[in-house]
Regions:
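Conserved beta-strand termini and adjacent loop/short-helix elements that scaffold enzyme active sites
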Residues: 32-34, 51, 62-64, 147-149, ...
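Internal alpha-helical scaffold of NAD(P)-dependent oxidoreductase catalytic cores
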Residues: 40, 93, 130, 136-208, ...
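Rossmann-like NAD(P)(H) cofactor-binding subdomain of soluble oxidoreductases
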Residues: 55-58, 63-156
């Protein structure tokens, strides 16, 4: 299987942490990055500092998704406001069976997809999250897997990520089902040394994480 992680459009470090962990599995992994971070990973590999230990990972990295084949799994770990800026660049690597995992804080673009609210909000895009539905149109919500991110990490210098705590990436299908693809993604994360609980109502978890963000991010 092939997987790519779209990282570092803004000031992210979670994508690099994911890439380091998942590179320990048998997945064919590529990292999409840019600027000094991409250059450092190309030249020296990605260094992960965790629990006082430093480990280096040689990763395939590119700043042009067009150089990649169609992917089985795509992790998006850019800042939420940047997703609409990158969707055009991903279209060539999204295939019929591609799963897209949004490892991003905030309400996801697919939030009301198969939400079963019994109202006219079902399958409705949120304009404040996804103006004019651009993300919804380019990233088919049927391909989406929800992900709530708990690890904390930082880029201390280009190509170097320091893990500050947490290993849990909570996953869920928009319709709450326990699908085969959900299990496969969870198994991959677990094989990489991460925790990947599967939830039947991930929207509850999204709000719990948001309450935490609202309470503590200002401190």
């Amino acid at each position: 299987s092939e997987m790519c992680i779209r990282d570092r459009f803004g000031a992210g470090s979670i994508g690099g942490y994911l890439a380091a962990c998942l590179s320990k599995t048998n997945i064919d992994l590529s990292l999409i990055a840019r600027g000094p971070h991409k250059k450092a990973i190309e030249e020296n590999g990605l260094t992960l500092i965790k629990e006082g230990r430093s480990e280096n990972f040689k990763l395939k990295v590119t700043d042009d998704p067009k150089t990649l084949d169609v992917q089985d799994y795509i992790f998006i770990s850019v800042k939420a406001h940047a997703i609409s800026n990158i969707v055009d660049s991903l279209k060539n690597i999204i295939g019929e069976k591609t799963s897209i995992i949004s490892a991003v804080n905030g309400l996801p673009w697919w939030y009301f997809y198969k939400a079963n609210t019994g109202t006219n909000l079902d399958n409705h895009h949120i304009d404040s999250v996804d103006p004019e539905g651009k993300i919804w149109k380019h990233l088919d919500p049927a391909k989406a897997i929800g992900c709530v991110v708990y690890p904390a990490a930082e880029i201390t210098e280009p190509g170097v990520i320091k893990h500050n705590g947490g290993e849990r990436f909570t996953l869920g299908e928009p319709d709450g089902s326990k699908s085969e693809r959900l299990k496969l993604i969870a198994d991959l994360l677990i094989a990489g040394g991460l925790k990947a609980p599967q939830k039947s109502n991930l929207r509850d978890e999204i709000w719990i994480k948001l309450w935490g963000n609202c309470s503590f991010n200002i401190i």
